[in-house]
Each structure stands twice: as C-alpha cells, then as structure tokens.
Amino acid sequence: MTKIGINGFGRIGRNVFRAALNNSEVEVVAINDLTDAKTLAHLLKYDTVHGTLNAEVSANENSIVVNGKEIKVIAERDPAQLPWSDYGVEVVVESTGRFTKKSDAEKHLGGSVKKVIISAPASDEDITVVMGVNHEQYDAANHNVVSNASCTTNCLAPFAKVLNEKFGVKRGMMTTIHSYTNDQQILDLPHKDLRRARAAAENMIPTSTGAAKAVALVLPELKGKLNGGAVRVPTANVSLVDLVVELDKEVTVEEVNAAFKAAAEGELKGILGYSEEPLVSIDYNGCTASSTIDALSTMVMEGNMVKVLSWYDNETGYSNRVVDLAAYMTSKGL
C-alpha cells in the first residue's frame, strides 16, 4: 500500500483524500496545510458540493482521525522543510496550486519520498500523464515530478484520442463550460484577469484555458491541431467540454457514438463514460469518470465536421485520477 502525503488540503486535496479512502492501494498518512487540524477535519467531513463524508472524522491538536486512523497534520510553508520521511510518505500529491514548477515541487523529494504528483498543469515537469491516454509512457527511472494535467485536459484527451485513432483529426476548437473555481471572486473584487474579477455566481465569464493545447503533451500527434477557451458559469461543480473537430474521414453520428461506446466499455473503461440519457450537470456530481460522452448531443455536418459534448465532475473525476496515477506509478516501481 502506497503511503501518500498531501500538500495543500483545499478542494482537490480533500477530494484526493476522499478518493483514497475508496482505493485499497493507497493510504494518506500525512497532510500539510497552514490551516488548523480542527478546521481541516470539519471541511473534510462536511462538503457543500459532495455531501457529508461517510466516515467518523475528528481532530486532535496536530492530526485528524478518520475511522480511527490518525493522519498527521503539518503546517510548514517551505516544501524543503517538510518531515515527510517521519511518516514514511512515498508519494507527495502537490495540490497547493503554488508549486507547479519542477524546481519547487522537487523540494518534496528525498528520504522516503520518491515521487511527486502535481495536481495541475506544470512547467518543466518530467512528464504529464493523463490516465488512459499516455500513462504507459511513465518511466519510474526518469520521471520523478509528474503532472496529472488539468481536469479539462483529463476530460478532453480520452475522447480526442478515440476520434483521432478511429477517424483522424484535422483540427478542432474546444470550449469548456466550466463551473466556477477558487481562482475567481465571489463578489466584484480585483483579479489579474478582469473578467475573473467579477462575481462568480452571477455571471457567465469568458476566460482562457490551456487544456486544448495541453492535449499535445499526452497526444503529440494532435500538436497544433486543437485550441480553445473557457466560459466559467454560475455552478459550483461539474463542467462540460464542447469540442468541434474536422475529421479526415466522413462519418455518421451513429459511427462516432459507436466508437465512443466501444472505448467506454473497453480500453477506457472507468476513464471514459458514455450516456444516452437526457441528463444535466447535477446528474454528474460525484461521477468518478474523467469524461462522459453526452451521446444525445453528438452532431455531424457535411460528413466530417463533428460536434461532441462530454461531461466531467471537475473535482471528483480528476481527484480519482490523481489516486489512480499514484497507484499506477507504484505498480511500476518508485
């Protein structure tokens, strides 16, 4: 069982913890966050979006206790000073959002810590991995600081892979209709992005995303072929990728959906979902898949222009992939 330390117990950190509770291959043994243990325990137990955690949760002065198991809580600003080895931590999940450069994230390495997973797009990382897409490229000997990409790249890449392998992708444009996140203001307040400065729960907010271009990190054959943007919307969770692509081959809606369904039931099972139900965003709250095709929305125009919608719980799905990645890396050797 892999021992995990979580650096940053925010939305993703806590959802990684929840996901780890349901995975017998990993266990969280230590958490680093500047917030006190009592507050962290309360926020773990009670969640507006995901509901009350089905576990006994309490707090001591420097630890939280979940189902009788004590997890140490540290409050250290400098990653290089963290005593991960005192608790046997082997993999650190870096989820503060602050240490996304390799030069910062690698400060966790040393002692018992063999690998770092950055729960965000990174810079200078050893490899970016999207489970189900390029995880087999992970090389334990050379990859120590690993990015799990973004939630949106984790949604887009699996079905872009299917489209490209089955029909060939010439080019495409993506929009993610994305729930608001902590990188927006709840009321109109200063922000470096003047649109994200506006009240998140009251506005649809056009903004940027690097998710489409980042697909090339895990699918090099699509480099330069995809681009896109985001619209942040007034929902607290669950997002939707809208992809329009021009394919090499002429296809029908039925052929495209059949390819998605086959992948969802086969090589991408658990990663890519497929639905023919007339569902809405709240129905995907808590969905552990990275991406779920909304088959009723698939459209084809003039044979080779295809529009695809795919849902994702941008917290739960992504956090489950972080845990899956940690388990996979361990299976290949730390």
Curated annotation (Swiss-Prot):
Location in or out of the cell: Cytoplasm
Binding site for D-glyceraldehyde 3-phosphate: S150, C151, T152, T181, R196, T209, G210, R232
Induction: Repressed by salt stress.
Known EC number: 1.2.1.12
Keyword terms: Cytoplasm, Glycolysis, NAD, Nucleotide-binding, Oxidoreductase
Catalytic residue list: C151
Subunit composition and interactions: Homotetramer.
UniProt protein name: Glyceraldehyde-3-phosphate dehydrogenase 1
